[in-house]
From Swiss-Prot:
Superkingdom to which the source organism belongs: Bacteria
Molecular function as annotated in GO: RNA binding
Protein name: Transcription antitermination protein NusB
Known role: Involved in transcription antitermination. Required for transcription of ribosomal RNA (rRNA) genes. Binds specifically to the boxA antiterminator sequence of the ribosomal RNA (rrn) operons.
Family indicated by similarity: Belongs to the NusB family.
A Pfam family per the record: NusB
NCBIfam families for this protein: nusB (TIGR01951)
Any GO BP: transcription antitermination
GO cellular component, one term: cytosol
């Protein structure tokens, strides 16, 4: 299943949207949306559990980043889809160590193009995520390894130093 991460991102977005509209928890909402194909794939389930767990555990911290970078907007005025795309992408950037931040941002933009109601949403999502990413990078709060490294030359340098 080549696109399982995109499918899972879309399912989690739908779950986040559902909990904003109904009185339910994220696990129940996401569980209703999982396909058998995802349930049968251990890598897909690992990614699902990691991403949904990160969103649940760090929602208030993630929302603080969004609020800080949407200074002219009250969180309640941000479209539900856009807000939840931002939450999901930030959870990936901050807590999914093997996914490069630029991949998370690009995926968020593509999902915004597919699910948001206006053409401006993808630009809004891109601008907010880019600003938050730059802050996180400056503050040294992005911790990636393996395929998630931001700069592979750093990985080579570290590998060369440890092999001496």
């Amino acid at each position: 299943m080549k696109t399982y991460r995109r499918q899972i991102r879309e399912k989690i977005l739908q779950a986040l949207y559902t909990i904003e509209l109904r009185d339910t928890d994220i696990d129940s909402a996401a569980g209703w949306l999982l396909t058998q194909e995802i349930l049968d794939d251990p890598n897909a389930m690992k990614f699902f559990n990691m991403l949904i767990g990160s969103i649940k555990a760090h929602m208030s911290e993630i929302d603080c980043y969004i609020e800080r970078h949407t200074f002219n907007w009250d969180m309640s005025r941000i479209a539900i889809i856009d807000k939840n795309i931002l939450r999901m992408a930030l959870a990936e950037i901050l807590y999914c160590e093997d996914i490069p931040p630029k991949v998370s941002i690009n995926e968020a933009i593509e999902i915004a193009k597919k699910f948001s109601s206006t053409e401006k949403s993808s630009k809004f999502v891109n601008g907010i995520l880019d600003a938050i990413f730059n802050e996180l990078k400056t503050d040294g709060k992005i911790h990636k390894n393996g395929r998630g490294l931001i700069d592979h030359s750093t990985a080579k340098l570290h590998k060369n130093e440890t092999s001496k």
